[in-house]
Swiss-Prot record:
Main function: Has cefotaxime-hydrolyzing activity.
Gene Ontology BP annotations: beta-lactam antibiotic catabolic process; response to antibiotic
GO molecular function, one term: beta-lactamase activity
Catalytic residues as annotated in Swiss-Prot or TrEMBL: S73
Annotated source species: Salmonella typhimurium
Region forming the signal peptide: 1-28
Name of the protein in question: Beta-lactamase CTX-M-6
Organism lineage string: Bacteria, Pseudomonadati, Pseudomonadota, Gammaproteobacteria, Enterobacterales
Pfam families listed in its UniProt record: Beta-lactamase2
NCBIfam families, per the entry: bla_class_A (NF033103), blaCTX-M (NF033089)
Length: 291
């Protein structure tokens, strides 16, 4: 597989095609995808980053995939996975209970707010963070791990040298242009998501739990999922923040094809811009066409 740095004006498409396809055909297809993504980005008025990994042969479709984007709530996958990793050596860990106080609540707590003055297990916090994007649940996972830097350290243990988590919810969603805090690149996130859900980064039981949580996500119907055939399986985690930042990362199971891993990150120049899940759906449709 070729490796190269992807610049704004470039798209890398490395796909296994039948031998009857000529190099000219491959070039034309690559140009078509590039042109469609460039047109989508231009019409949206924002900055779009896309990374798709075809696990059948580890070929990739990359667009602005080595630029940093604010992760927002897509970072919850890493925090939940870090707790799952700990549970490999402590089979009772996910049943450990964490106290939920009114003072713990932040700006979005659809699950945690039901447990104020009570407790939640780490398993419930993982499900709440990934399936409902509960911000208090995320903060409790981070606190259990020992802080944002411990989430970053877990990423480093997986070989991800790009991911960085610096803050907790909700400040990690500020998404200020040029601010490196709480960012990664589409390609780095795609590679790590692949390792966590389809690779050996987690033991089988923990990997299955992570995939189950992602497949049960309730927040992604208008994002990547909206750009895919309804018959395909999807597990995803969305994210949103200031500057109209709109994200989704997903593992996709097409019919009769090996899984795909897709990361779509999008942000805009105005701090109060609205989210654009339609851009993510359109990008997903473009890059998965033909699978």
């Amino acid at each position: 597989m070729m490796t190269q740095s992807i610049r704004r004006s470039m798209l890398t498409v490395m796909a296994t095609l039948p031998l009857l396809f000529s190099s000219a055909t491959l070039h034309a297809q690559a140009n078509s995808v590039q042109q469609q993504l460039e047109a989508l980005e231009k019409s949206s008025g924002g900055r779009l980053g896309v990374a798709l990994i075809n696990t059948a042969d580890n070929s990739q479709i990359l667009y602005v995939a080595d630029e940093r984007f604010a992760m927002c709530s897509t970072s919850k996958v890493m925090a939940a996975a870090a707790v799952l990793k700990q549970s490999e050596s402590d089979k009772h860990l996910l049943n450990q209970r964490v106290e939920i106080r009114a003072s713990d609540l932040v700006n979005y707590n659809p699950i945690a707010e039901k447990h104020v003055n009570g407790t939640m297990t780490l398993a419930q916090l993982g499900a709440g963070a990934l399936q409902y994007s509960d911000n208090t649940a995320m903060n409790k996972l981070i606190a259990h791990l020992g802080g944002p830097d411990k989430v970053t350290a877990f990423a480093r243990s997986l070989g991800d040298e790009t991911f960085r988590l610096d803050r907790t919810e909700p400040t990690l969603n500020s998404a200020i242009p040029g601010d490196p805090r709480d960012t990664t690149t589409p390609l780095a996130m795609a590679q790590t998501l692949k390792n966590l859900t389809l690779g050996k980064a987690l033991a089988e039981t923990q990997r299955a739990q992570l995939v189950t949580w992602l497949k049960g996500n309730t927040t992604g119907s208008a994002s990547i999922r909206a750009g895919l055939p309804k018959s395909w399986g999807v597990g995803d985690k969305t994210g949103s923040g200031d500057y109209g930042t709109t994200n989704d990362i997903a593992v996709i199971w097409p019919e009769n094809h090996a899984p795909l891993v897709l990361v779509t990150y999008f942000t805009q120049p105005e701090q109060k811009a609205e989210s654009r899940r339609d851009v993510l759906a359109a990008a997903a449709k473009i890059v998965t066409h033909g699978f």
